[in-house]
């Protein structure tokens, strides 16, 4: 324990908390360019081919972002909007691509939870 004199000289410091979405630099979303679009396998006990893109953000940081929904039209040099939100079974993937904005199309024939996947209301 510090003495009162040490506290007068130095004071106490607050512990700094780590931000989960540091690459967004405090923004809710950030624009970026796809540098690589690929599939990867999840950790045990799951099995699939998850669609992931490597994105260079306007903040200058390159991150891995998950492409949600069935089917996508992304390729290298596509402009995407990236939001926070990790994918639990993909280590190192802490961002998601927003469907239906910029070059990313919405999910076709989506009936429920449409706003999350950028799908328009069917007439």
Curated annotation (Swiss-Prot):
Organism placement in taxonomy: Bacteria, Bacillati, Actinomycetota, Actinomycetes, Mycobacteriales
Secretion signal, residue range per the UniProt entry: none
Pfam families noted in UniProt: Ribosom_S12_S23 (PF00164)
One of the record's GO cellular component terms: small ribosomal subunit
Functional description taken from the UniProt entry: With S4 and S5 plays an important role in translational accuracy.
Record-linked NCBIfam families: rpsL_bact
Top-level taxon: Bacteria
Record carries keyword Ribosomal protein: yes
GO MF annotations, alphabetized: rRNA binding; structural constituent of ribosome; tRNA binding
Region (Disordered): 1-26, 103-123
Subunit structure and binding partners: Part of the 30S ribosomal subunit. Contacts proteins S8 and S17. May interact with IF1 in the 30S initiation complex.
Annotated family: Belongs to the universal ribosomal protein uS12 family.
GO biological process: translation
Keyword rRNA-binding: yes
Protein name: Small ribosomal subunit protein uS12
Residues where 3-methylthioaspartic acid is found: 89
SUPFAM superfamilies: Nucleic acid-binding proteins
Compositionally biased region (Basic residues): 113-123
Keywords: Methylation, Ribonucleoprotein, Ribosomal protein, RNA-binding, rRNA-binding, tRNA-binding
